[in-house]
A protein has these predicted regions:
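Terminal amphipathic alpha-helical/low-complexity segments used for targeting or macromolecular assembly
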Residues: 1-63, 179-182
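Short linear capping/connector segments at secondary-structure termini
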Residues: 49, 68-69
Length: 185
């Protein structure tokens, strides 16, 4: 049987009256309970990882550290590698899929947004998605936003408060809104 992510990847748009749109909102509602419980009160990293496994439906390596509060709307479309650090107040809107490879650092208040609304006024309540991939040893600085369809290259750095709208190659530093290459590593 096809997963929700597989269905989403087959279409360019998900309109508000589509059956898929309804399915998405049901799944999102199921995730909200786990997010609320995880963010309520002190949790050891082991307890946080147990919640993340419920949220993602996947095994999470014990080397992953996530600071609370942490928000995700769907959860099942997040894949964590090893030795990842996610600082507090991160927001992962993961409907389009988020892959975080090994040794990645994600600063506080980072937003990974795999969903956008359709620009055409008659379809504006609909959704367009694109996967975000953060390659090995990348670092996303505090307050940055990465938009749908973007890949952050291996060893690359996104400077604080940047907005990444296009793919970032390996071994560079990007900064600004929209983010542009400011240095090669």
């Amino acid at each position: 049987m096809e997963t929700l992510l597989e269905k989403i990847k087959k279409v360019n748009e998900i309109l508000k009256d589509d059956e898929l749109f309804k399915e998405i909102h049901i799944a999102k509602g199921e995730n909200e309970k786990f997010i609320a419980e995880m963010n309520n009160g002190y949790k050891t990293n082991e307890e946080k990882l147990e919640y993340l496994e419920k949220i993602t439906g996947k095994s999470i390596n014990k080397s992953v550290t996530v600071s609370l509060p942490f928000q995700t709307d769907f959860g099942k479309h997040i894949s964590f590698g090893k030795n990842i650090f996610v600082n507090k107040e991160a927001i992962f809107v993961d409907l389009g899929g988020i892959t975080i490879e090994d040794d990645v650092l994600i600063g506080p208040k980072v937003s990974l947004l795999t969903v956008n609304h359709i620009l055409e006024p008659s379809k504006r309540r609909g959704l367009a998605t694109g996967e975000i991939i953060i390659k090995k040893n990348a670092w996303i600085g505090a307050g940055s936003t990465v938009l749908a369809g973007v890949t952050i290259g291996e060893n690359s750095v996104v400077a604080a408060n940047s907005t990444v709208t296009k793919n970032v190659p390996d071994n560079v530093i990007v900064a600004g809104t929209p983010a542009k290459i400011i240095k090669k590593l």
